[in-house]
C-alpha cells in the first residue's frame, strides 16, 4: 500500500484487484481509542457523527424503557451481519469485538470473542524508562497478553477463519466473514520471526 519497509503481498494483491479510497479518513472518536469508532462505523454503517448515537442505543441496559428497547432492537437488526444474514449469507466473526452488542447474537457463528486490549501485561506499557532495566520481550509468552493461552492471538483468530472457510464452502450460500485482529494494539506483541523481520 505504498510502504517499502513493510512486506504486505496479500494486502497489495487485494488492493490491486479492488477499490481503494485514497481520501477516506476516520475523523476521530468519542473516546481515546479511535478503533472503537471505526468498529462501530463498520458494524452499524454510520459515519462518525452518528456512530456514537448507535453505540449508546445498543448499550441500553436492563432498566431501559419500552421505547429504548424498541430502538435497541431496531438498531441491532440493522447491524451489518444482520443485514447480510437476511440477504442469505452465512455470517461469521472471530477476534476483537468491542461493540455495544453481543457478537454471538449479531453473527450466526462467533468464535473467540475478545473485548479491547489485554490489560494484564503491565511490563509492556510505559517503557523503557531511563536508568531502569527493561525485561520486556514482545515474543516471550510469560508476559501473557496476546500470548495468553500459549499461542499468539493472531494465530488463534487466523485458524478460526481458515476453519470456518472449510465449513462454509460445504454450504451453497455465500458467506460474510468479519475477522478482527487485536495485535496492532498495545502491548504490541508478536512472534519472534516478525520482531526480527522489522527491527526497531
Per-range role (PLM):
Residues 1-200:
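Formylglycine-dependent sulfatase
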Amino acid at each position: 500500500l505504498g510502504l517499502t519497509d513493510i512486506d504486505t503481498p496479500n494486502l497489495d494483491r487485494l488492493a490491486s484487484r479492488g477499490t481503494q479510497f485514497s481520501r477516506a479518513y476516520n475523523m476521530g472518536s468519542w473516546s481515546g481509542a479511535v478503533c472503537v469508532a471505526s468498529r462501530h462505523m463498520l458494524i452499524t454503517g454510520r459515519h462518525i457523527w452518528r456512530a456514537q448515537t448507535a453505540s449508546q442505543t445498543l448499550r441500553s441496559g436492563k432498566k431501559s424503557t419500552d421505547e429504548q428497547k424498541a430502538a435497541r432492537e431496531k438498531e441491532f437488526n440493522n447491524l451489518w451481519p444482520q443485514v447480510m444474514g437476511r440477504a442469505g449469507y452465512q455470517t461469521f466473526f472471530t477476534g476483537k469485538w468491542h461493540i455495544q452488542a453481543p457478537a454471538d447474537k449479531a453473527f450466526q457463528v462467533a468464535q473467540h470473542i475478545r473485548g479491547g486490549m489485554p490489560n494484564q501485561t503491565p511490563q509492556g506499557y510505559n517503557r523503557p524508562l531511563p536508568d531502569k532495566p527493561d525485561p520486556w520481550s514482545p515474543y516471550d509468552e510469560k508476559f501473557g497478553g496476546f500470548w495468553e493461552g500459549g499461542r499468539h492471538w493472531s494465530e488463534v483468530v487466523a485458524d478460526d477463519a481458515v476453519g470456518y472457510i472449510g465449513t462454509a464452502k460445504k454450504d451453497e450460500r455465500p458467506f460474510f466473514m468479519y475477522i478482527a485482529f487485536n495485535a496492532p494494539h498495545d502491548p504490541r506483541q508478536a512472534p519472534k520471526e516478525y520482531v526480527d523481520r522489522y527491527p526497531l
